[in-house]
Amino acid sequence: VIRLPRGCHTATHLVALAPLEYWESLYPSRTGVNWPAAASDLHKSSAAMGIFAAERIRGRGAWWDEGRTVLHLGDRLITPEGEHPITKPFRSRHIYQRLKRLEGPCGVEPLTVQEAGVIVGIANRFRWEVPASGTLLLGWVVLAPICGALRWRPHLWLTAGAGSGKSQILDRFVAPLLGDLSLVVVGATTEAGLRQTICCDAVPVVFDEAESIEKG
């Protein structure tokens, strides 16, 4: 999404939106392009569209969009109908912004029952205080990449003493399973910094060592 004030509807700014040939074909003049006419039409079209609502912008991640699922991977959308390039018109009241490409799950075959069983076995081998914790961890890993499409987003808090291996579980088990459909940050990250990084994305956030060092 590019914000263009009224005074910036000039040749330099407009050719950044579309190539010169586009403007020459729509607004020809003896000297090249009738830029005032192009700016006038853009102003009228903008007024006809109504007030822009920033909350309609959607970043990368999984979304629920009027009865259908949409997986936004930066440069393309994955819907039940197939893959849709982000630069092509897409029927929706929301605006799916073009962003850095994510690989996501595309091109990867789903795990077989036997392969999934290996993952379950690894999760259950960690030294849990409560045996069901391995299953709970896997449940969160499965739901986390589609958190944006869920009405309620599950949270997971991994607790243990210092040096017990929490970071190892996150780095060597959780992170490889999530792939690039997650944001990994350290405990020193501020709320403002986190909001700025996430922006409009709907991806799970993994905090490493998100614990207080203050003593009460």
Question: Model-found features: residue ranges?
Answer:
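Structured core elements
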Residues: 70-72, 157, 205-206
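Residue-level signal for secondary-structure boundary elements
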Residues: 31-32, 50-54, 127, 131, ...
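Short helix/loop capping segments that flank catalytic or ligand/cofactor-binding pockets
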Residues: 79-82, 167, 214-215
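Generic detector of short, locally flexible boundary/turn motifs and exposed helical patches
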Residues: 22-40, 119-126, 168-175, 215-216
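P-loop NTPase catalytic core of nucleic-acid-dependent motor ATPases
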Residues: 87-201
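Conserved nucleotide-sensing/catalytic segment adjacent to the nucleotide-binding pocket
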Residues: 194-216
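Short, flexible loop/turn elements at secondary-structure junctions
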Residues: 75, 162, 209-211
